[in-house]
Amino acid sequence: MATLLFDDGREATAAEIEAIARAHRIVVEHRPVPAALAETLARPLLDDTSAATVLDALPPRPEFPSRDLIVLHPDRPDNEQLATKFENWHRHAGDEIRHILDGAGIFGVIVDGQRADLHVGPGDFIVVPAGLEHNFRLTAARRIKAVRYLSDAEGWSAEFTGRAA
């Protein structure tokens, strides 16, 4: 289950996470990863056929006609380049929707003027609403597999804000 840590080191309670998420239109849910995917998701990298198998095992979301699977792992040659790009603070014209299937990451958000880190792992489903400034960082393990749901490709383009990472 997702946890929220503030810059001062304090961890938000479940009630605080719910209140903060509601106030900022962030969706944080837990949707279990199908057990049938365990063997496929255990692989460090996935080819197109394996990625399609993963996507086919998850129900489509009609409101988000496009989806793909992002796989970041130390064995991926461009892993650090991609990870660094996501670490820059940005916003999108459309919602950013992720269903974490394997690994872990951290969505940084600004809550009431204070930076907060939403730690996500397998089964966490998060929607960062359009226009909300955020970033994404890998944990020390440097790996994650997540479905990205898109309403359209244009709304997904990042507008970098210049805030220091």
UniProtKB/Swiss-Prot annotation:
Pathway: Amino-acid biosynthesis; L-methionine biosynthesis via salvage pathway; L-methionine from S-methyl-5-thio-alpha-D-ribose 1-phosphate: step 5/6. The gene is mtnD. GO terms for biological process: L-methionine salvage from methylthioadenosine; L-methionine salvage from S-adenosylmethionine. HAMAP family: Salvage_MtnD. Its EC number is 1.13.11.54, 1.13.11.53. SUPFAM superfamilies: RmlC-like cupins (SSF51182). Its cofactor is Fe(2+); Ni(2+). InterPro entries: ARD, ARD_bac, RmlC-like_jellyroll, RmlC_Cupin_sf. Pfam families: ARD. It catalyses: 1,2-dihydroxy-5-(methylsulfanyl)pent-1-en-3-one + O2 = 3-(methylsulfanyl)propanoate + CO + formate + 2 H(+); 1,2-dihydroxy-5-(methylsulfanyl)pent-1-en-3-one + O2 = 4-methylsulfanyl-2-oxobutanoate + formate + 2 H(+). The record marks R98 as: Important to generate the dianion. Keywords: Amino-acid biosynthesis, Dioxygenase, Iron, Metal-binding, Methionine biosynthesis, Nickel, Oxidoreductase. Catalyzes 2 different reactions between oxygen and the acireductone 1,2-dihydroxy-3-keto-5-methylthiopentene (DHK-MTPene) depending upon the metal bound in the active site. Fe-containing acireductone dioxygenase (Fe-ARD) produces formate and 2-keto-4-methylthiobutyrate (KMTB), the alpha-ketoacid precursor of methionine in the methionine recycle pathway. Ni-containing acireductone dioxygenase (Ni-ARD) produces methylthiopropionate, carbon monoxide and formate, and does not lie on the methionine recycle pathway. The lineage of its organism: Bacteria, Pseudomonadati, Pseudomonadota, Alphaproteobacteria, Hyphomicrobiales. This is Acireductone dioxygenase. Monomer. Ni(2+) binds at H90, H92, E96, H134. GO terms for molecular function: acireductone dioxygenase (Ni2+-requiring) activity; acireductone dioxygenase [iron(II)-requiring] activity; iron ion binding; nickel cation binding. It comes from Rhodopseudomonas palustris (strain ATCC BAA-98 / CGA009). Fe(2+) binds at H90, H92, E96, H134. Binds 1 Fe(2+) cation per monomer. Binds 1 nickel ion per monomer. Gene3D superfamilies: Jelly Rolls (2.60.120.10). Belongs to the acireductone dioxygenase (ARD) family. The record marks D95 as: May play a role in transmitting local conformational changes.
